Every structure is written in structure tokens, then in C-alpha cells.
Amino acid sequence: MTGLGVMVVMVGFLAIASLQSESRPCDTPDLGFQCGTAISHFWGQYSPYFSVPSELDASIPDDCEVTFAQVLSRHGARAPTLKRAASYVDLIDRIHHGAISYGPGYEFLRTYDYTLGADELTRTGQQQMVNSGIKFYRRYRALARKSIPFVRTAGQDRVVHSAENFTQGFHSALLADRGSTVRPTLPYDMVVIPETAGANNTLHNDLCTAFEEGPYSTIGDDAQDTYLSTFAGPITARVNANLPGANLTDADTVALMDLCPFETVASSSSDPATADAGGGNGRPLSPFCRLFSESEWRAYDYLQSVGKWYGYGPGNPLGPTQGVGFVNELLARLAGVPVRDGTSTNRTLDGDPRTFPLGRPLYADFSHDNDMMGVLGALGAYDGVPPLDKTARRDPEELGGYAASWAVPFAARIYVEKMRCSGGGGGGGGGEGRQEKDEEMVRVLVNDRVMTLKGCGADERGMCTLERFIESMAFARGNGKWDLCFA
């Protein structure tokens, strides 16, 4: 298997007790992060996972039996990337050397040192993924009692460790369930697909030259620059007034805002004395968070949403194409047939039942936020949503449930469910009638929000028939716009 450039590894057991030894009331399996929500739910892709409001009932209907469940998950909370970490160190250094005084609320910056490191999963991120595994088990208990998920992960350390933590959470829930009929042992097997340049990897696709390096590669940054110019000026002026001599730019202001979520998810302390000043319930938010108002955090959230939409999602002509390979793998799993794809799939892996088995009831894959944006685009999750305004903020309720914080926060998860219903639900025919008894139905949830998939005529419960769902994936089945990647 090593000759295929892939490893099937045994997951090392990280004692769940050590992860759960501290009280963590802010972050629970069912609801995710619920402290300081007026701020913490508006950090874009740096938000810790939280259960997103759903207009449709997200529970499994009483008249339906789930027969298949797939989760595609982002890794848990991490430290900044190496490039961003270096930029934050430079920013703090410039403040220390330039500022001649520190205004009210800014005094902590006088002695602040950047100590977050780079790239690695944080303790909060580990716990998020343990909680995610617990939640997956509980939701799909009827299947999970009988079968553990088949696990794949992109090869970066934080993603692999997230997959490990997920399996530990799943396993702890299984052991606590007296009704379970399987007794697997940790570590679980998993397929680790390397993220080396040029590798076919649907969980981290970087093969599309025009998207990675060509004219499509700057669309997201350009859109963010446009929106940033509409709101950041007054904030930067206020920050500079409190840090005279620092001479910060709008980009520096955004970097200071970035440090709020990164500092918060890096902390595992519980200090009730400072809880009310930040997140409450024993998990204070970083002092960086208090430098900005709630309305400014909403603008920050939208800035990140614009970047993801135009950088990797439906707003980029090649964004959804990056998710086509995974969607074609999903279709193969749903239908129980071999993968048919001409994009980013690895034919060697997907053609081997050891590394891509069909007929399993549970699957769990682990990836990155940008790759998940491509998958959501390829699924048509936000079809019908107008192009995001680059000059005025829009709320997610106006955008079909889209915001970076609602779609791809740390530990984000997409659930794809297949179920048989007894005839009491809708039929995937645009709401025009009821399905045949025991017809197979498919539904997609993004962080607990039921997505109304327009392409397959989702019913009043968000369900489409399996046949209509597969038919509606014509974009993916036709390889998207892959031909433009190398034009």
C-alpha cells in the first residue's frame, strides 16, 4: 500500500478521559460552542462549530429508517497557519515598537507575546472532534450499534488527528451504549491520503492549475478587498487612536480581529472570575475580542463569508468544480456502484475495496474548509442564492443559510443521510405528492441545518428520492468545468 502513496494506519488512542477531564460547558456534543455567542458565532471560518438554526426539522422522522450516513468534516480548531502566524508576530512587533501609549482596553498589548504556534490542532479542537464523534454515534445510533464508520482523511497532521479524535468520541459513545452489538477496539483503521503536490486527493484537491495559480485564484481576495474598504476605515482609525504611533492599516485591523478567535480556541483554561468579561461559563474569550463591537464582528463574519464564497464556493466559476471528485465518490457510495469521475479522484484507491469499500452503512471523511466549500458548491447546496454583495452586508437568512461561520467553522460537518420512509413524507417531486412506500430518500444537513436542495425537488422535510438526487448531480457526473483547469 505504501507504493500507492497512501497509508492505512492504525489510529493511536488518545485517552478520552484526559480530553474530558476539564469542565467544558461552553462546548457540548449537541450544540457546539455556546459561550459569548453574540461574538463567537461571527468569526467566519474561525468560529468554533455550533449548531446552526434550521428552518426544517433536522431530527430523523419517526416514519423513516436511516440506512446510510456519510459525514464530511473539517478538522477541529487549530493554531494559525505558518504564514499567518509569521504575519501576526510581525504585527505585534510593529505595535510594540511604534505605539507610544496604550488606550483603555488595549493595555494588555503592552506585554502581549504571540505564543500560539502554527498549524497544529489545539486542545479545544481535539475536544470538538471527540464531541463530533459522540454526536455522530448518537444521531445514527441504529446503524452505529452494528457497524463502525469507514474512515478516510487528508494527510495533514491536524486533519489526521481530528479523525483520530472523532473515532475516540464515537468509540466512547459505543461503549456507553448497552444496546450495541459490536465491540471493536481502538485504534480504528483509517485511510490517510497524502496531501503532496500533484496527488489525486478528493479531500484536499490542488490539481486545477487555473484555480490554484491562474486568473481564478485571486477572485476571493479581490472580493474581500472591495468589502473591506466599505467598513474597516472607522475601525482602524479608532484602533490607531488607542495605539498612537502604531500606524496600522485596515489589513492590520483584520489581523487583530483574527487573534480573537485564535486566542480563544487555543485556551483550555477555566477561570470563572473572568468568564463574564468574555464568553461566560468558565471559558473567557480573548481580550482581543473586546476591542471590537458586535456589529463590527458581524462585518468581520461577512468579510470571511465573501472570501470563501468567491474564493472557493459558488461565486468562483471553478469553485464547485473542486468538489466534484468527492461528490462522485458520494454518489458511488449511495448507489453502491463503482466511482465514475474524471477529476480529482484516485482511481487506484477508489478501485480497491480495501481503500474504498461499497455497501457500508457509515462513512466518515476529514478535510479542510476550502475543500468543503467546493463540495457544497458541487452539491448545489446554495443554488438560487444570489451573488454575495461586495459592498453591503447580508445576513445568512437572506443567503439560503450561507455564511462562512454557518458553513465551514472549525469542526464543521456535512451529513448526507439515506433513509427508507413508510410513505408519510414528501416525494422529492417539488412538493407535489408523496413518495412510494419504502422509497429511498436522501437529505443533506450542514451543521444541523437541513438544506433544501432545489435541483432534486426537495420536499417539505428537505428530502429527495435517491433517483432524483443522483439525477440532479449532473454537474458532478459531467466533471464540472474540469476542462477549464488546464486551458
UniProtKB/Swiss-Prot annotation:
Gene3D superfamilies recorded for this chain? Phosphoglycerate mutase-like (3.40.50.1240)
Q: Name one GO cellular component term.
A: extracellular region
Keywords (alphabetical) are: Disulfide bond, Glycoprotein, Hydrolase, Secreted, Signal
Relay the pH-dependence remark from the record. Optimum pH is 5.5-6.0. Active from 3.5 to 8.5 with phytic acid as substrate. The optimum pH is shifted to more acidic values with 4-nitrophenyl phosphate as substrate.
Q: What GO molecular functions are on record for this protein?
A: 3-phytase activity; acid phosphatase activity
Q: Which residues carry attached sugars according to the database record?
A: N165, N200, N247, N346
Q: What does this protein do?
A: Catalyzes the phosphate monoester hydrolysis of phytic acid (myo-inositol hexakisphosphate), which results in the stepwise formation of myo-inositol pentakis-, tetrakis-, tris-, bis-, and monophosphates, as well as the liberation of inorganic phosphate. Myo-inositol 2-monophosphate is the end product.
**What name does this protein carry?**
Phytase A
Gene behind this chain?
PHYA
